[in-house]
Amino acid sequence: MSDSLIDLLLEIGKALIVLVGIVGAGAFMSFIERRLLALWQDRYGPNRVGPFGLLQLAADMIKMFFKEDWIPPFADRRIFVLAPIIAFTAFILAFAVVPITPTWGVADLNVGLLYILAIAGLAVYAVLFAGWSSNNKYSLLGSLRASAQTLSYEVFLGLSLMGIVIQTGSFNLRDIVEAQAGLWNVIPQILGFITFLFAGVAVTHRHPFDQPEAEQELADGYHIEYAGMKWGLFFVGEYIGIVLISSLIVTLFFGGWHGPWLPPFIWFALKTACFMVFFILLRASLPRPRFDQVMSFGWKVCLPLTLLNMLVTGAVVLMNAQ
């Protein structure tokens, strides 16, 4: 067997391991969310299936698998089926350039940040396809809300990272992590971190920025007509998006795998888990604002913060260069 074939098989195996880990983390987060919400609300939560309710996730997956695969009679069948597939795969593909350890990662691209922003933007098409193809007014309104919110906050998501690019001089995520060996970016880039955090919550449509799925207004939004495994793809895709944003926060602002004593993978996993719990805490503690307030907050607060961060970072870099 040639060396090139062995290298190819190793890369495929590495990609499969990362894929299984990402999907497993996203699915397991749904269980952790239910348990933590129950703990904070002084109730039990899922605790009947398996020890401590750990097999509840498997029971839910079996239930979704055997549910009727129903498509509305007036829906556009092809686009209706395509939408959840895009939603599920977009965030998974973005993980290809996230460096987990100094030696572990699927791909090492010099334009890694641009790749993530471009791939994550594909999720907008999934939302639009789902709302339009369902032939349901609530689905359409939810998809319009989601697309407007996502497109707006992706602008702030990208601009909040320009300070890091100016500071490190690279779009490569591995170079950005290596540059944080002495000082994490969250300290000099505190404005960028705050804006990225707000934008990340909005892009993943998580509470309190979950207006596209507001049950009281839109009856669960753009995936109201979905059931079974199609709904499951949307569901797991949302949690994979949370894992992606949490890992990006760790990679870009909190030193990635850097940390004392413990192995790099453990540090990366612990930091990512902390921000995943933070997402759950937001759902448990904050009310949902109106949609116009969410959009106004983005353009009137997040945009000026990102521009100010870019201006200050550029000025500091120029002063240090002289």
Curated annotation (Swiss-Prot):
Cellular localization per UniProt: Cell inner membrane
EC number: 7.1.1.-
Segments passing through the bilayer: 12-32, 79-99, 111-131, 151-171, 183-203, 234-254, 262-282, 301-321
Catalytic activity line of the entry: a quinone + NADH + 5 H(+)(in) = a quinol + NAD(+) + 4 H(+)(out)
Membrane disposition: Multi-pass membrane protein
The entry's keywords: Cell inner membrane, Cell membrane, Membrane, NAD, Quinone, Translocase, Transmembrane, Transmembrane helix, Ubiquinone
MF (Gene Ontology): NADH dehydrogenase activity; oxidoreductase activity, acting on NAD(P)H, quinone or similar compound as acceptor; quinone binding
Enzyme's top EC category: translocase
Assigned GO CC terms: plasma membrane
Principal subcellular localisation of the protein: membrane
GO biological process, one term: aerobic respiration
Oligomeric and partner information: NDH-1 is composed of 14 different subunits. Subunits NuoA, H, J, K, L, M, N constitute the membrane sector of the complex.
PANTHER family linked: NADH DEHYDROGENASE SUBUNIT 1, NADH-UBIQUINONE OXIDOREDUCTASE CHAIN 1
Entry similarity comment: Belongs to the complex I subunit 1 family.
General function of this protein: NDH-1 shuttles electrons from NADH, via FMN and iron-sulfur (Fe-S) centers, to quinones in the respiratory chain. The immediate electron acceptor for the enzyme in this species is believed to be ubiquinone. Couples the redox reaction to proton translocation (for every two electrons transferred, four hydrogen ions are translocated across the cytoplasmic membrane), and thus conserves the redox energy in a proton gradient. This subunit may bind ubiquinone.
Protein name: NADH-quinone oxidoreductase subunit H
Lineage: Bacteria, Pseudomonadati, Pseudomonadota, Gammaproteobacteria, Aeromonadales
Name of the gene this protein is made from: nuoH
